[in-house]
Protein backbone atom coordinates (compact mmCIF):
# COMPACT_ATOMS: atom_id res chain seq x y z
CA UNK A 1 0.00 0.00 0.00
CA UNK A 2 1.24 3.58 -0.55
CA UNK A 3 3.25 4.84 2.40
CA UNK A 4 1.30 8.17 2.63
CA UNK A 5 -2.00 6.26 2.99
CA UNK A 6 -0.49 4.05 5.66
CA UNK A 7 0.81 7.06 7.58
CA UNK A 8 -2.61 8.74 7.37
CA UNK A 9 -4.30 5.75 8.99
CA UNK A 10 -1.60 5.53 11.67
CA UNK A 11 -2.17 9.21 12.48
CA UNK A 12 -5.92 8.58 12.84
CA UNK A 13 -5.30 5.59 15.09
CA UNK A 14 -2.94 7.56 17.34
CA UNK A 15 -5.42 10.43 17.64
CA UNK A 16 -8.49 8.31 18.37
CA UNK A 17 -6.64 6.03 20.79
CA UNK A 18 -5.86 8.98 23.08
CA UNK A 19 -9.50 8.97 24.17
CA UNK A 20 -9.41 5.35 25.32
CA UNK A 21 -5.83 4.92 26.52
CA UNK A 22 -5.57 3.29 29.95
CA UNK A 23 -9.22 2.17 29.64
CA UNK A 24 -8.28 -1.50 29.27
CA UNK A 25 -7.41 -2.68 32.76
CA UNK A 26 -5.80 -5.87 34.00
CA UNK A 27 -8.27 -8.31 35.54
CA UNK A 28 -6.51 -11.58 36.27
CA UNK A 29 -9.02 -14.05 37.66
CA UNK A 30 -8.80 -17.70 38.68
CA UNK A 31 -11.25 -20.44 39.57
CA UNK A 32 -10.55 -23.11 42.17
CA UNK A 33 -11.97 -25.88 39.95
CA UNK A 34 -8.68 -25.87 38.05
CA UNK A 35 -6.29 -25.59 41.01
CA UNK A 36 -5.43 -29.28 41.11
CA UNK A 37 -5.10 -29.53 37.33
CA UNK A 38 -2.77 -26.52 37.20
CA UNK A 39 -0.54 -28.21 39.77
CA UNK A 40 -0.15 -31.38 37.71
CA UNK A 41 3.62 -31.81 37.15
CA UNK A 42 3.02 -33.91 34.04
CA UNK A 43 1.79 -30.92 32.05
CA UNK A 44 4.14 -28.87 29.93
CA UNK A 45 4.12 -25.06 29.52
CA UNK A 46 1.68 -25.04 26.57
CA UNK A 47 -0.96 -27.06 28.42
CA UNK A 48 -0.58 -24.98 31.58
CA UNK A 49 -0.94 -21.74 29.62
CA UNK A 50 -4.20 -23.03 28.19
CA UNK A 51 -5.43 -24.00 31.67
CA UNK A 52 -4.53 -20.57 33.06
CA UNK A 53 -6.71 -18.98 30.39
CA UNK A 54 -9.63 -21.30 31.13
CA UNK A 55 -9.26 -20.64 34.86
CA UNK A 56 -9.43 -16.90 34.27
CA UNK A 57 -12.50 -17.18 32.04
CA UNK A 58 -14.31 -19.22 34.70
CA UNK A 59 -13.10 -16.86 37.41
CA UNK A 60 -14.54 -13.89 35.54
CA UNK A 61 -17.86 -15.66 35.06
CA UNK A 62 -17.91 -16.18 38.82
CA UNK A 63 -16.78 -12.65 39.67
CA UNK A 64 -19.51 -11.12 37.52
CA UNK A 65 -22.18 -13.39 38.99
CA UNK A 66 -22.85 -15.11 35.67
CA UNK A 67 -22.63 -18.69 37.00
CA UNK A 68 -26.33 -18.92 37.79
CA UNK A 69 -28.64 -21.92 37.67
CA UNK A 70 -31.25 -22.33 34.94
CA UNK A 71 -28.76 -20.93 32.43
CA UNK A 72 -27.59 -22.28 29.10
CA UNK A 73 -23.90 -21.50 28.65
CA UNK A 74 -23.11 -21.31 24.94
CA UNK A 75 -19.50 -21.81 23.91
CA UNK A 76 -19.23 -20.48 20.37
CA UNK A 77 -16.31 -21.88 18.41
CA UNK A 78 -15.96 -24.60 21.03
CA UNK A 79 -13.24 -26.60 19.29
CA UNK A 80 -12.51 -29.78 21.23
CA UNK A 81 -14.65 -28.62 24.15
CA UNK A 82 -11.99 -28.06 26.80
CA UNK A 83 -13.53 -24.83 28.10
CA UNK A 84 -16.98 -26.39 28.16
CA UNK A 85 -15.63 -29.40 30.06
CA UNK A 86 -14.33 -27.24 32.90
CA UNK A 87 -17.44 -25.09 32.79
CA UNK A 88 -19.59 -28.21 33.18
CA UNK A 89 -17.40 -29.35 36.10
CA UNK A 90 -17.89 -25.94 37.72
CA UNK A 91 -21.66 -26.09 37.32
CA UNK A 92 -21.63 -29.62 38.73
CA UNK A 93 -19.75 -28.44 41.83
CA UNK A 94 -22.25 -25.60 42.23
CA UNK A 95 -25.07 -28.17 41.92
CA UNK A 96 -26.69 -26.17 39.14
CA UNK A 97 -28.65 -29.14 37.85
CA UNK A 98 -30.99 -26.95 35.81
CA UNK A 99 -28.15 -25.43 33.83
CA UNK A 100 -26.77 -26.71 30.54
CA UNK A 101 -23.79 -26.27 28.24
CA UNK A 102 -24.13 -25.89 24.48
CA UNK A 103 -21.05 -26.32 22.30
CA UNK A 104 -21.12 -24.81 18.82
CA UNK A 105 -18.39 -25.71 16.34
CA UNK A 106 -18.50 -25.86 12.54
CA UNK A 107 -15.55 -28.24 12.15
CA UNK A 108 -15.56 -31.97 12.80
CA UNK A 109 -12.69 -32.49 15.23
CA UNK A 110 -10.93 -35.56 16.55
CA UNK A 111 -10.00 -36.14 20.20
CA UNK A 112 -12.89 -34.09 21.52
CA UNK A 113 -13.60 -33.90 25.26
CA UNK A 114 -17.15 -35.11 24.67
CA UNK A 115 -16.62 -38.47 26.40
CA UNK A 116 -15.52 -36.63 29.54
CA UNK A 117 -18.43 -34.22 29.20
CA UNK A 118 -20.87 -37.12 29.13
CA UNK A 119 -19.69 -38.13 32.61
CA UNK A 120 -20.82 -34.87 34.24
CA UNK A 121 -24.25 -34.35 35.77
CA UNK A 122 -24.81 -31.23 33.67
CA UNK A 123 -26.71 -31.45 30.39
CA UNK A 124 -24.22 -30.96 27.56
CA UNK A 125 -25.12 -30.68 23.88
CA UNK A 126 -22.78 -30.27 20.91
CA UNK A 127 -24.02 -29.03 17.56
CA UNK A 128 -22.11 -28.67 14.34
CA UNK A 129 -23.00 -25.32 12.79
CA UNK A 130 -21.55 -22.17 11.31
CA UNK A 131 -22.10 -19.25 13.68
CA UNK A 132 -23.16 -17.10 10.72
CA UNK A 133 -26.16 -19.39 10.16
CA UNK A 134 -26.95 -20.14 13.80
CA UNK A 135 -30.40 -19.37 15.22
CA UNK A 136 -30.00 -20.00 18.93
CA UNK A 137 -33.69 -19.66 19.94
CA UNK A 138 -34.55 -22.62 17.70
CA UNK A 139 -32.24 -24.94 19.65
CA UNK A 140 -34.10 -26.92 22.29
CA UNK A 141 -31.41 -26.45 24.94
CA UNK A 142 -31.69 -22.67 24.58
CA UNK A 143 -35.49 -22.70 24.44
CA UNK A 144 -35.69 -24.53 27.78
CA UNK A 145 -33.27 -22.24 29.62
CA UNK A 146 -34.32 -19.14 31.52
CA UNK A 147 -31.00 -17.37 30.88
CA UNK A 148 -28.28 -17.50 28.22
CA UNK A 149 -24.58 -16.70 28.74
CA UNK A 150 -22.07 -16.60 25.89
CA UNK A 151 -18.48 -17.82 26.21
CA UNK A 152 -15.62 -17.86 23.72
CA UNK A 153 -11.92 -18.59 23.95
CA UNK A 154 -9.78 -17.14 21.17
CA UNK A 155 -12.57 -17.07 18.61
CA UNK A 156 -10.82 -16.12 15.41
CA UNK A 157 -11.29 -12.81 13.59
CA UNK A 158 -14.78 -11.96 12.42
CA UNK A 159 -16.17 -15.11 14.04
CA UNK A 160 -16.26 -12.99 17.21
CA UNK A 161 -18.46 -10.42 15.47
CA UNK A 162 -20.69 -13.17 14.13
CA UNK A 163 -20.94 -14.56 17.68
CA UNK A 164 -21.91 -11.16 19.08
CA UNK A 165 -24.54 -10.74 16.38
CA UNK A 166 -25.82 -14.25 17.06
CA UNK A 167 -26.21 -13.56 20.79
CA UNK A 168 -27.91 -10.20 20.19
CA UNK A 169 -30.33 -11.85 17.75
CA UNK A 170 -31.07 -14.35 20.49
CA UNK A 171 -31.81 -11.49 22.87
CA UNK A 172 -34.04 -9.79 20.29
CA UNK A 173 -36.10 -12.97 20.07
CA UNK A 174 -37.05 -12.58 23.73
CA UNK A 175 -34.44 -14.76 25.45
CA UNK A 176 -32.61 -13.32 28.45
CA UNK A 177 -28.98 -13.08 27.38
CA UNK A 178 -27.60 -12.30 30.82
CA UNK A 179 -24.02 -11.69 29.77
CA UNK A 180 -20.86 -13.06 28.21
CA UNK A 181 -17.11 -13.49 28.58
CA UNK A 182 -15.38 -13.48 25.22
CA UNK A 183 -11.67 -13.58 24.48
CA UNK A 184 -10.33 -12.42 21.13
CA UNK A 185 -7.89 -13.71 18.55
CA UNK A 186 -6.60 -13.02 15.03
CA UNK A 187 -8.02 -9.53 14.57
CA UNK A 188 -6.25 -9.34 11.21
CA UNK A 189 -9.00 -11.69 9.99
CA UNK A 190 -11.82 -9.26 10.74
CA UNK A 191 -13.94 -7.87 7.91
CA UNK A 192 -15.86 -4.62 7.65
CA UNK A 193 -19.11 -6.21 6.46
CA UNK A 194 -19.42 -8.40 9.58
CA UNK A 195 -17.74 -6.09 12.13
CA UNK A 196 -20.25 -4.97 14.78
CA UNK A 197 -18.45 -1.74 15.71
CA UNK A 198 -18.98 0.07 12.40
CA UNK A 199 -21.13 2.79 14.00
CA UNK A 200 -18.35 3.71 16.43
CA UNK A 201 -15.71 3.75 13.71
CA UNK A 202 -17.82 5.87 11.38
CA UNK A 203 -18.42 8.28 14.27
CA UNK A 204 -14.66 8.76 14.79
CA UNK A 205 -13.87 9.00 11.08
CA UNK A 206 -12.69 5.48 10.26
CA UNK A 207 -14.05 4.08 6.98
CA UNK A 208 -13.95 0.59 5.49
CA UNK A 209 -10.62 1.17 3.73
CA UNK A 210 -9.04 2.47 6.94
CA UNK A 211 -10.43 -0.56 8.77
CA UNK A 212 -8.84 -2.99 6.32
CA UNK A 213 -5.49 -1.24 6.78
CA UNK A 214 -5.87 -1.38 10.57
CA UNK A 215 -6.52 -5.12 10.40
CA UNK A 216 -3.21 -5.46 8.59
CA UNK A 217 -1.42 -3.32 11.16
CA UNK A 218 -2.69 -5.58 13.96
CA UNK A 219 0.00 -8.09 12.99
CA UNK A 220 2.61 -5.63 14.24
CA UNK A 221 1.31 -6.19 17.78
CA UNK A 222 1.44 -9.98 17.77
CA UNK A 223 4.46 -10.56 15.52
CA UNK A 224 6.67 -7.65 16.57
CA UNK A 225 7.45 -6.52 13.05
CA UNK A 226 5.01 -8.75 11.19
CA UNK A 227 8.16 -9.66 9.32
CA UNK A 228 7.17 -12.73 7.34
CA UNK A 229 4.05 -11.18 5.85
CA UNK A 230 5.67 -7.81 5.37
CA UNK A 231 8.85 -9.26 3.90
CA UNK A 232 6.86 -10.85 1.10
CA UNK A 233 5.22 -7.54 0.29
CA UNK A 234 8.53 -5.70 0.45
CA UNK A 235 10.11 -8.18 -1.94
CA UNK A 236 7.29 -7.62 -4.41
CA UNK A 237 7.58 -3.83 -4.20
CA UNK A 238 11.36 -3.76 -4.29
CA UNK A 239 11.58 -2.24 -0.80
CA UNK A 240 13.84 -3.81 1.80
CA UNK A 241 12.61 -4.09 5.38
CA UNK A 242 14.91 -1.35 6.68
CA UNK A 243 13.94 0.98 3.84
CA UNK A 244 10.25 0.42 4.60
CA UNK A 245 10.88 1.28 8.26
CA UNK A 246 12.73 4.41 7.18
CA UNK A 247 9.86 5.54 4.96
CA UNK A 248 7.20 5.19 7.66
CA UNK A 249 9.54 6.56 10.34
CA UNK A 250 8.83 3.85 12.92
CA UNK A 251 11.11 1.37 14.61
CA UNK A 252 9.94 -2.09 15.64
CA UNK A 253 8.88 -1.03 19.12
CA UNK A 254 6.84 1.86 17.72
CA UNK A 255 5.25 -0.45 15.17
CA UNK A 256 4.26 -2.85 17.93
CA UNK A 257 2.61 0.04 19.77
CA UNK A 258 0.64 1.00 16.66
CA UNK A 259 -0.50 -2.61 16.25
CA UNK A 260 -1.71 -2.74 19.85
CA UNK A 261 -3.61 0.52 19.40
CA UNK A 262 -5.36 -0.93 16.34
CA UNK A 263 -6.34 -3.99 18.38
CA UNK A 264 -7.63 -1.79 21.19
CA UNK A 265 -9.80 0.27 18.85
CA UNK A 266 -11.29 -2.75 17.07
CA UNK A 267 -12.20 -4.28 20.43
CA UNK A 268 -13.43 -0.93 21.72
CA UNK A 269 -15.90 -0.77 18.84
CA UNK A 270 -17.26 -4.13 19.97
CA UNK A 271 -17.61 -2.79 23.50
CA UNK A 272 -19.59 0.23 22.28
CA UNK A 273 -21.82 -2.08 20.24
CA UNK A 274 -22.70 -4.13 23.32
CA UNK A 275 -23.29 -1.03 25.41
CA UNK A 276 -25.75 0.18 22.79
CA UNK A 277 -27.50 -3.18 23.13
CA UNK A 278 -28.05 -2.59 26.86
CA UNK A 279 -25.00 -4.20 28.46
CA UNK A 280 -22.45 -2.95 30.95
CA UNK A 281 -19.03 -3.91 29.60
CA UNK A 282 -15.44 -4.19 30.76
CA UNK A 283 -12.58 -4.62 28.31
CA UNK A 284 -9.64 -6.14 30.16
CA UNK A 285 -6.43 -8.15 30.08
CA UNK A 286 -7.55 -11.48 31.49
CA UNK A 287 -4.10 -13.13 31.57
CA UNK A 288 -0.54 -11.85 31.40
CA UNK A 289 1.04 -11.39 27.98
CA UNK A 290 3.58 -14.13 28.75
CA UNK A 291 0.64 -16.57 28.69
CA UNK A 292 -0.61 -15.29 25.32
CA UNK A 293 -0.24 -12.08 23.34
CA UNK A 294 -3.96 -12.41 22.56
CA UNK A 295 -4.83 -11.62 26.17
CA UNK A 296 -7.80 -9.24 25.89
CA UNK A 297 -11.38 -10.16 26.70
CA UNK A 298 -14.71 -8.43 27.01
CA UNK A 299 -17.05 -9.07 29.92
CA UNK A 300 -20.61 -7.96 29.30
CA UNK A 301 -23.50 -8.06 31.72
CA UNK A 302 -27.12 -6.98 31.35
CA UNK A 303 -27.34 -3.40 32.58
CA UNK A 304 -30.08 -4.22 35.09
CA UNK A 305 -28.20 -7.21 36.55
CA UNK A 306 -26.36 -6.86 39.86
CA UNK A 307 -22.87 -8.28 40.43
PLM regions and their residue ranges:
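Class I S-adenosyl-L-methionine
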Residues: 1-307
Amino acid sequence: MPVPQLLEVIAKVNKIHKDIQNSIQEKLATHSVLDEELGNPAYGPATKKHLVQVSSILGLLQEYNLLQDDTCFVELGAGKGKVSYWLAKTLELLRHSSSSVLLVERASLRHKHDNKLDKTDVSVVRIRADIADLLLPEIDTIAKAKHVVGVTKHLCGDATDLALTCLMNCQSSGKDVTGMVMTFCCLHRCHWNTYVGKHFFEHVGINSVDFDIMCGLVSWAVCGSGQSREKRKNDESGLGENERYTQIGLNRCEKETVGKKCKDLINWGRKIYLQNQGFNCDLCYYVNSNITLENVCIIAMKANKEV
